[in-house]
């Protein structure tokens, strides 16, 4: 088995993680308890991509709009489509991040880091200020990655435990509570 086949075989894990994360974000009104980090806020917004099938028979469903309009994406889950891309806004403390997460490769796209006093000031040309700004941005990237990694670890703890069956039942119930979307 080559590397590409291995990625394809394991992509379901990222799709399950993204679906679990979406459910967790709605379970407590956007607040997710993360051990060691406290509560963080997660909002799935604007853009989702769902997939079904493989090869030439693959179908893609792109859902975009306001949070309320993402009902079509939940309807897609009901008919067996898998969440592949999602735009997420995450708030941890005073820092608000926005990014797209691609499930199959756990790839980040279109990352927006929080605005800080350092990044909002006019460029002074001062080397120390520039170095400070770069270090601050590196810190913010690391904070984002560490937080998403902690969320993934939390998911794996449940997914690989006997607690997965009750959790899966809750997720299925959440998916099925959405009325099937019939566009007029």
Label the model's feature ranges:
Residues 1-184:
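Intrinsically disordered, low-complexity, charge-rich terminal extensions
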């Amino acid at each position: 088995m080559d590397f590409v086949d291995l990625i394809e075989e394991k992509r379901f894990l990222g799709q399950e993680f993204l679906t679990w994360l979406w459910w967790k974000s709605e379970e407590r009104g956007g607040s997710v308890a993360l051990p060691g980090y406290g509560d963080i806020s997660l909002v799935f917004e604007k853009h989702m991509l769902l997939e079904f099938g493989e090869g030439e028979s693959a179908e893609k469903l792109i859902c975009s709009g306001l949070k309320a309009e993402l009902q079509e994406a939940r309807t897609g889950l009901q008919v067996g489509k898998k969440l592949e891309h999602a735009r997420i806004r995450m708030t941890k403390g005073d820092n608000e991040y926005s990014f797209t997460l691609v499930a199959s490769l756990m790839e980040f796209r279109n990352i927006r880091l929080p605005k800080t006093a350092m990044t909002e000031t006019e460029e002074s040309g001062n080397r120390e200020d520039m170095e400070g700004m770069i270090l601050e941005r590196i810190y913010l990237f690391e904070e984002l990655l560490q937080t998403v990694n902690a969320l993934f670890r939390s998911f794996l703890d449940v997914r690989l435990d006997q607690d997965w069956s009750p959790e899966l039942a809750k997720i299925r119930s959440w998916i099925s509570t959405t009325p099937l979307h019939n566009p007029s």
